[in-house]
């Protein structure tokens, strides 16, 4: 699973996800992509399970790029702990995803294979997604 090697600070604020993705919203490497349509935190486990589903379906054919990286730590307090006494310890890592962000890209396979592989990966994601090709990159983000 993905996680940063080292960070400047151990714990982050939760923040909020306003607006559309300003960066990472164009296809850069492949010919086909999976685009997010909703804002969400996507965990490193979800990213990895989507990647595995795509590689298994494509039978090691083509190349896959993961365009998101989980760089935000999510902290949790131990169960049945009293209020106060500080913030919990980091439990897992998430990638902050806004609508329009490209999650995965694919190249070297036919469109039908890419579409089917990305459909399987989309079932692993906690959000609605959209399959796009390099030609449709400028298409509006419509659910």
Swiss-Prot record:
Subunit comment: Part of the 50S ribosomal subunit.
InterPro entries: Ribosomal_uL16, Ribosomal_uL16_bact-type, Ribosomal_uL16_CS, Ribosomal_uL16_dom, Ribosomal_uL16_sf
Record's subcellular location: Plastid, Chloroplast
Source taxon at top rank: Eukaryota
Cellular component aspect of the GO annotation: chloroplast; mitochondrial large ribosomal subunit
Transmembrane region(s): none
Cysteine pairings via disulfide bonds: none
Predominant subcellular localization, coarse grouping: plastid
Name by which UniProt lists this protein: Large ribosomal subunit protein uL16c
UniProt GO BP: mitochondrial translation
Pfam families on file: Ribosomal_L16 (PF00252)
GO molecular function annotations of the record: rRNA binding; structural constituent of ribosome
Family stated for the protein in its record: Belongs to the universal ribosomal protein uL16 family.
Keywords: Chloroplast, Plastid, Ribonucleoprotein, Ribosomal protein
Encoding gene, per UniProt annotation: rpl16
């Amino acid at each position: 699973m993905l996680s940063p090697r080292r960070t400047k600070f151990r714990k982050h604020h939760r923040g909020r996800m306003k607006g559309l993705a300003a960066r990472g919203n164009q296809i850069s490497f492949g010919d086909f992509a999976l685009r997010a349509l909703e804002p969400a935190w996507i965990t490193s486990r979800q990213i990895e399970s989507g990647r595995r589903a795509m590689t298994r379906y494509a039978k090691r054919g083509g190349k896959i790029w993961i365009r998101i990286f989980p760089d935000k730590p999510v902290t949790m307090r131990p169960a049945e702990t009293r209020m106060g006494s500080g913030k919990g310890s980091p439990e897992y890592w998430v990638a902050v995803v806004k609508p329009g962000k490209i999650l995965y890209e694919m190249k070297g396979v036919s469109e039908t294979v890419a579409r089917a592989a990305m459909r399987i990966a989309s079932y692993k994601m906690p959000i609605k997604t959209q399959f796009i090709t390099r030609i449709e990159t400028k298409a509006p983000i419509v659910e």
